[in-house]
Curated annotation (Swiss-Prot):
Keywords: Acetylation, Cell cycle, Cell division, DNA damage, DNA repair, Mitosis, Phosphoprotein, Repeat, Ubl conjugation pathway, WD repeat. GO terms for biological process: anaphase-promoting complex-dependent catabolic process; cell division; DNA repair; lens fiber cell differentiation; mitotic G2 DNA damage checkpoint signaling; negative regulation of cellular senescence; positive regulation of cell population proliferation; positive regulation of ubiquitin protein ligase activity. InterPro entries: Cdc20/Fizzy (IPR033010), WD40/YVTN_repeat-like_dom_sf (IPR015943), WD40_CDC20-Fz (IPR056150), WD40_repeat_CS (IPR019775), WD40_repeat_dom_sf (IPR036322), WD40_rpt (IPR001680). It comes from the Eukaryota. The keyword Transcription does not apply. Residues 32-42, 146-160 have a biased composition (Polar residues). Residues 31-51, 64-88, 105-166 are annotated as: Disordered. This is Fizzy-related protein homolog. Belongs to the WD repeat CDC20/Fizzy family. The unphosphorylated form interacts with APC/C during mitosis. Interacts with NINL. Interacts (in complex with the anaphase promoting complex APC) with MAD2L2; inhibits FZR1-mediated APC/C activation. Interacts with SIRT2. Interacts with USP37. Interacts (via WD repeats) with MAK. Interacts with RBBP8/CtIP; this interaction leads to RBBP8 proteasomal degradation. Interacts with HECW2. Interacts with SASS6; the interaction is regulated by CENATAC and leads to SASS6 proteasomal degradation. Interacts (via N-terminus) with CCNF. Interacts with CDC6. Interacts with TK1 (via the KEN box).
Amino acid sequence: MDQDYERRLLRQIIIQNENTVPCVSEMRRTLTPANSPVSSPSKHGDRFIPSRAGANWSVNFHRINENEKSPSQNRKAKDATSDNGKDGLAYSALLKNELLGAGIEKVQDPQTEDRRLQPSTPEHKGLFTYSLSSKRSSPDDGNDVSPYSLSPVSNKSQKLLRSPRKPTRKISKIPFKVLDAPELQDDFYLNLVDWSSLNVLSVGLGTCVYLWSACTSQVTRLCDLSVEGDSVTSVGWSERGNLVAVGTHKGFVQIWDAAAGKKLSMLEGHTARVGALAWNADQLSSGSRDRMILQRDIRTPPLQSERRLQGHRQEVCGLKWSTDHQLLASGGNDNKLLVWNHSSLSPVQQYTEHLAAVKAIAWSPHQHGLLASGGGTADRCIRFWNTLTGQPLQCIDTGSQVCNLAWSKHANELVSTHGYSQNQILVWKYPSLTQVAKLTGHSYRVLYLAMSPDGEAIVTGAGDETLRFWNVFSKTRSTKESVSVLNLFTRIR
């Protein structure tokens, strides 16, 4: 073996052992003669440290957070949603641009950055680069500062500072209004609250139906079924907001003119209480404890336009028409979620994944064919379905009974109300299923939910005999950058 190569090899072994095992290195020093060539210092190392000046730093920073975060990191990510946290993220991105040349132009949301940031297309370079690129960078590439620029930071940092800042989402955890609702029943299978398109709230209390105007705060009693020996089990407004349907304990469905306070008709056909109602233009669908779903056109005699849908083996407690009025979703106490169309008397789709009664049903107004459903105490899950293909999509365990679901009209979010054992109201972001807000205040199961016609407020009802109004959703505002006289980059100062 070549002596020079042997000396270099032995020198590397000794250096490695000195860094790992100090006692062994001391022993080697005592055993090595002073005139040995091993002890002579090296003037030129044979290890090369690669230069990473051309690395994709946005991907490298993303790789740091790929592992599971610790509780302290999760707490920091939660704090990052505040104003101070967002300022810290912007400052951190600015430092990465100026010190490391990261080229970040937009501050990412800490809750969605790890989900959506994907590595960009890699550049065609060698695995290791041992010298800087000889190509001269121009001021237009964004990383260098032009000699004629008045800003002390690079072009990429200027774009970062000019990027529009998304306003902080703040949802009040205190209801803006609370109304007393005496005799509001604590029954999971009933639907006693609905909000009309004319901004009038209908509530079934015992044997009566009351109307509350959100514009004038005036309360009127629409009907009293005590004379008939009956009670209210469901209410539902028509799409135009002029008619309200009232389901009764004896199985009748009454149609009332809300403005005139006059009963227009009484529909028969059910043999048990009617707990679910759903309008589709002039057609009214009703679900009952007799396991039957009846569809009737209120403009014609009942027997001429009646359709009987049989598919559930227990009480029907949830009914919702799709936003395009083509499909009807029904949930029952048999843990089934069925989907019907206009042309068939049998369900076109059947989902049996829930482990408890399915009362909470909601069709997405943002994605065609997307259906959400929630299960009772033994299930506690919110499930999402693609009714176009019949495939299940996502599922999340909420930890408590799911009583109601409603999609936001303005954003891809939905709200859920819960019973045993949390009695809470949750706001979710879809499809990430991250929790946006948690509202508490009811002491009983939050069994009833309705949304205002403008889509910004919701009302919840519970067995604690209260109705609580919450500002949950907000209309989308313009993200156009505001031109201010104080803007550093649009005015000469």
